[in-house]
Amino acid sequence: MNFENLLIEVGTEELPPKSLRKLAESFLSNFTDELKKAELSFESAVWHAAPRRLAICVNQLALAQADKVVEKRGPAIAQAFDTDGNPTKAAMGWARGNGITVEQAGRLKTDKGEWLLHQAKVVGVETKSLIAAMAQRSLDKLPIPKPMRWGNNTTQFIRPVHTVTMLLGSEVVEGELLGQKSARIIRGHRFMGKASFELVHADNYLSALKEQGKVEANYEVRKALIKAGAEAAAAKIGGVADLEDDLLEEVTSLVEWPVVLTANFEEKFLDVPAEALVYTMKGDQKYFPVFDKAGQLMPNFIFVTNIESKDPQQIIAGNERVVRPRLADAEFFFETDKKDSLESRLTSLETVIFQKQLGTIKDRVARISDMAGFIANSIDANADEAARAGLLSKSDLMTNMVMEFTDLQGTMGMHYARLNGETEAVALALQEQYKPKFSGDTVPTAPVSVCVALAEKLDTLVGIFGIGQAPKGAADPFALRRAAIGILRICVENNLPLNLIDLIAKAQELHGSNLTNDKAAEQVLEFFMGRFRAWYQDQGVSVDVILAVLARRPTSPADFDSRIKAVSHFRSLEQASALAAANKRVSNILAKVEGELPAAIDAGLLVENAEKVLAEKLNELQPQLAPLFAAANYQEALALLADLRESVDTFFEDVMVMADDEALKNNRLALLSSLREQFLHAADISLLQ
């Protein structure tokens, strides 16, 4: 079989930078799926992407499908011939449908019988005749939320398409994609190199674009060039560039020929909180800020231009002119905001509605303040500072800086609190109240910050459930799932002695008559249980371990976590499988008992040696287990219980639980109930697989 390399490039107008990687990866994934469905072999495949192009390269693609033999089974021999041995209508119809006579058919013999069989040879189709249709289907499946039309075309795509190039080796693959016929034409850089050129061979794609078109189409190479260039530029001025990957990806998707340059801004702007300056540089201008070795922002920034200039200083000066008004705005907002304290802004919070049924933002901060103080008393934090931080938690929403740069809420509150003379604990809590903001974000650990972060999330969660607006399906407009996970993570990662039932009840109390859903507490608790499951599954914890703990419905997050870790460890023990099976057996036996189970074990009714041994071992373990369970040391407790495996196995081998003698039976049920009760202190081990 012969092989060739394939190139497919779609040349477009500028593609959305934040979608470029996803589009390219999806194009490649869709196309390789098509190749596999068509049974076309290939060695490897890669994607390339730049602002005005999506491309895939397939290495060593088979030039045709392999020939194959398809077996088509006909009627059973008993139905294929009559008693005289002549073909039946069924046999002749089947043969005719396959283009043969009955006499030409073979036979298929199995242990289940014998059938007519036709082995048809299917000649493989040439690859070049399949490519265009496969490519079109691949493009049709791209994740494009809002496709557009252009010109007089009825074709839709994410951006107007100007060229399509499909080359199988040096041969142009005939066909049409997105309204454009395939040709050799490749467009180069808008302002450098050749505007367009003919590509001779698929293998030359990257090199020809680079040499003739002044385009680096290899996305990862382009990204690496930008990263290395920015690092070198920052080091040259004694700093370190902030190369956050999301911004690095976006900049990579904005340029075809990256040139890294360094610019400056006036040092006076450094009096403005660094976060505001960084937000402006990164968010608005796509610049990389530079920090010194002490972590302080420097009056410099690094940017990437899409052109090589004979006078780069002119480009630098232009970017400095562009960023200056933005920094000046931030400076003005900051200086203006400083004239009023956070406390003085509380009155203005009355004008902002949090939620129609839940009141204003001022009502909300009053609840957060009370809730933070309540939590502080429960975890030995400073209740006055927690209440103060809760009261001021939303005041920065009324500042010019946050109104202009909404992502700085909390952060600007921290800076203004420091300027107002608030304690550092209060100031830090204002910044950390929203943490964790996303999966993988850190949780607050400072006691006052913990109190406010929990209070802020609980107020939202209980309030929204309390007015009957729980999340439905994928819709979650108040981000309640994130809030619930945040609460659980803060409690677990700080090992806080808090109970969800108490927290929910206090939040309900603070909302008062605002809440109309009388089942809110129950629903919120159930919501937390669901979040527990989702969170631990994301961490790779086995579902059966999670279900074993959920069966006990622990309402303290830290306690829940201790049980998860203990059961995960227990599950890895040699004895776990047998004890899980035994627990399941015990559970089934006890479930069939009518009425109440016997309360205590009567030693005088222990007849068989196996039941005496099990009862004795249980009796010996209980004084050791009680303090372990009381201290939530479930791992050590389950390790002790694991030692019962042999005694439990022997009990079930030698003892008839449901004895005819009622007294013996009840005593044995009491023994099994006592055994199961010890395991249930940690989890329902019977659910382990």
Swiss-Prot record:
This is Glycine--tRNA ligase beta subunit. Belongs to the class-II aminoacyl-tRNA synthetase family. GO terms for biological process: arginyl-tRNA aminoacylation; glycyl-tRNA aminoacylation. PROSITE patterns: AA_TRNA_LIGASE_II_GLYAB (PS50861). It comes from Shewanella sediminis (strain HAW-EB3). SUPFAM superfamilies: HD-domain/PDEase-like. Its EC number is 6.1.1.14. The lineage of its organism: Bacteria, Pseudomonadati, Pseudomonadota, Gammaproteobacteria, Alteromonadales. It comes from the Bacteria.
